[in-house]
């Protein structure tokens, strides 16, 4: 009986030790897996923009490698989709136009601005088919207009309609991502298309689309760089590195626009001549967010709330990481 008891006790001890060992291994493996995940910077980008140039050159990876970081790039059809991924924790940072952060903040997304590009009003426009009878924004009354909901061009449409005395309710917005909007535009399913570069320039080149009006005098059309609040608070030094690498990429682009266009062409599937046109009418010069810029964002937010495009009033300064005077 004593021998049997000792045997059972020994078996119990062996099982307990094995369990503790395996649990320790699992915890170590989980810890290593978490460390590996923490060392990956997840960046969202769109079809064209400064981050797209940075990705193509691969310089950010080279700078971060000695620090033990890797970069994971994910492409999105537009800013709203990118910020949704940022909201649910699938990304650490990315870039959008001026309107998407407004919609994201109104939805409670934990995002912060950390930098922006200069204004670029010529980089977006309301287009109509080359043989369309529509000659003015006034003619858009009662028409179907394709646009990516919540994107920078959403604000362009709002401003253009107001400028020409048309109520937002007097047009029929058709919310489509760029690729689907292009198809609808070519098939005649919509009367006009509000779109940004490079889709804008490509539509001009490939379909002969006519510019009804661009953003000049109507919108600022800035490109913003945003991060999840938690990432920004924990990794300000990484945001500084990204900022500096964007600066370098922009200097190279300004000095060699034709070369950069040729380099990006096969990667984007867009002709170099079209990309060069985009680069020529675009402004460069990343800068820290200022109070003035945030105040301009507030005006957009107030307008969207007035039109009931967002469910509540927001304070854009609450999404500010840092303000330079």
Labelled PLM ranges:
Residues 1-40, 325:
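Short, low-complexity disordered leader/linker segments with a strong preference
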Residues 33-36, 129-144, 233-237:
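Flexible hinge/capping segments at coil-to-helix
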Residues 34-49, 69-75, 142-146, 172-174:
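Short, well-ordered beta-strand elements
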Residues 40, 47-75, 80-81, 85, ...:
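Short, polar/charged alpha-helical segment
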Residues 52-54, 77-113, 122-130, 134-135, ...:
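Pocket-flanking alpha-helical
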Residues 54-69, 154-173, 204-207, 262:
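Ligand-binding cleft/hinge of the Venus flytrap
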Residues 99-100, 170-265:
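Pocket-lining segment of extracytoplasmic ligand-binding domains
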Residues 233-309:
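Secondary-structure end/capping motifs
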């Amino acid at each position: 009986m004593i021998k049997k008891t000792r045997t059972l006790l020994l078996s119990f001890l062996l099982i307990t030790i094995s369990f503790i060992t395996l649990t320790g291994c699992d915890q170590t493996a989980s810890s290593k897996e978490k460390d590996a995940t923490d060392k990956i910077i997840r960046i969202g980008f769109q079809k064209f923009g400064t981050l797209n140039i940075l990705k193509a050159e691969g310089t950010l990876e080279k700078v971060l490698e000695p620090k033990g970081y890797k970069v994971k790039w994910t492409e999105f059809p537009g800013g709203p989709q990118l910020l949704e991924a940022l909201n649910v924790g699938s990304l650490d940072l990315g870039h959008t136009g001026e309107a998407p952060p407004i919609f994201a903040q109104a939805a409670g997304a934990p995002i912060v601005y950390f930098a922006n590009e200069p204004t670029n009003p010529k980089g977006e426009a309301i287009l109509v088919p080359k043989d369309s009878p529509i000659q003015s924004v006034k003619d858009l009354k009662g028409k179907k207009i394709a646009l990516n909901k919540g994107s920078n061009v959403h604000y362009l449409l709002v401003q253009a309609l107001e400028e020409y005395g048309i109520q937002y309710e007097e047009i029929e917005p058709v919310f489509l991502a760029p690729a689907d909007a292009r198809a609808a535009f070519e098939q005649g399913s919509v009367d006009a298309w509000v779109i940004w570069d490079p889709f804008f320039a490509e539509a001009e080149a490939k379909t002969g689309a006519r510019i009804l009006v661009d953003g000049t005098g109507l919108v600022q059309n800035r490109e913003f760089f945003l991060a999840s609040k938690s990432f920004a608070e924990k990794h300000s030094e990484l945001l500084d590195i990204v900022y500096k690498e964007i600066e370098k990429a922009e200097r190279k682009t300004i000095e060699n626009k034709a070369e950069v266009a040729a380099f990006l062409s096969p990667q984007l599937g867009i002709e170099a001549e079209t990309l060069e046109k985009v680069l020529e009418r675009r402004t460069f010069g990343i800068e820290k967010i200022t109070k003035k810029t945030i105040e301009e964002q507030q005006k957009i937010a107030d307008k969207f709330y007035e039109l009931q495009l967002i469910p509540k009033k927001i304070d854009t300064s609450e999404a500010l990481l840092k303000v330079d005077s």
